[in-house]
């Protein structure tokens, strides 16, 4: 007769898995932050341009660019901040959209389009140009205009809607990008109530309860488990491990430069 595990043993196994996958990485990130000289206040942070993008007048094609940067102060232990930059062909100025937690959530051109975020170098996730970008821009602009959480007081740092919830909402309207925000973009999984359906990239399936708990399985997302907005999982497309706080550890991700479909 095969012995069965006792309920106490099973509970201990689950608790150990939660500790190993969710709590330990956050404690490690907190320790690294405590030992760092990262700015603790926005007043001390560098918000200057990094020079990643040319002047809009020197870039003729339409472009859609998505950036992330480690969030400021203690929030950087848990999350990155995401924003989107776009321009129509021959337009003389970039348009940068962010969502923030004070005043009106949606902000236009409050910072340099390729600026550091709280002193942290931005990471470019996608850079679509030419006719493909021109095709996406009207839907992106419509999503910005119709965003459900655009009024003062709508912002919630956790579990959302926050800056990452905003960019995730945009990605859902342009699934041909085949893009997902990093696993440490806390708030990206926020959806009001219960959701079961396609992932943000359109390449998989997810179940989600208000961004607080969920499971994803997809080509772009890999395998992800969401617990209280923290994500652990595996990336099989570009092999890597996903851990709360650290995001993704593994093979470097290429910048998305063409539509997936």
Task: Name each model-derived stretch.
Residues 94, 108, 144, 178, ...:
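Ubiquitin-like/PB1-type beta-grasp interaction modules and other compact soluble beta-rich domains
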Residues 2-46, 148-261:
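Activation targets extended, charge/polar-rich intrinsically disordered C-terminal tails
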């Amino acid at each position: 007769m095969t012995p069965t595990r006792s309920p106490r043993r099973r509970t201990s196994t689950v608790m150990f898995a939660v500790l190993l996958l969710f709590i330990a990485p956050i404690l490690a990130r907190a320790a690294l932050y405590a030992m760092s000289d990262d700015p603790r206040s926005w007043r001390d942070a560098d918000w200057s341009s990094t020079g990643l993008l040319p002047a809009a007048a020197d870039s003729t094609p339409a472009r859609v660019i998505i950036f992330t940067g480690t969030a400021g102060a203690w929030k950087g232990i848990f999350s990155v901040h995401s924003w989107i930059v776009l321009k129509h062909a021959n337009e003389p100025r970039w348009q940068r959209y962010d969502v923030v937690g004070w005043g009106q959530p949606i902000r236009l051109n409050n910072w340099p389009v390729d600026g550091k975020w709280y002193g942290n170098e931005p990471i470019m996730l996608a850079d679509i140009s030419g006719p493909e970008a021109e095709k996406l821009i009207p839907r992106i602009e419509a999503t910005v205009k119709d965003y459900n959480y655009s009024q003062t007081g709508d912002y919630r740092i956790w579990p959302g809607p926050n800056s990452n919830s905003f960019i995730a909402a945009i990605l859902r309207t342009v699934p041909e990008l085949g893009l997902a925000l990093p696993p440490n973009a806390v708030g990206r999984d926020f959806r009001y109530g219960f959701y079961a359906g396609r992932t943000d990239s359109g390449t998989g399936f997810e179940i989600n309860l208000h961004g607080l708990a969920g499971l994803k399985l997809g080509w772009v997302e890999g395998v992800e488990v969401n617990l209280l907005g923290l994500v652990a999982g595996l990336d099989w497309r570009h092999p890597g491990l996903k851990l709360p706080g650290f995001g993704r550890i593994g093979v470097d991700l290429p910048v998305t430069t063409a539509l997936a479909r």
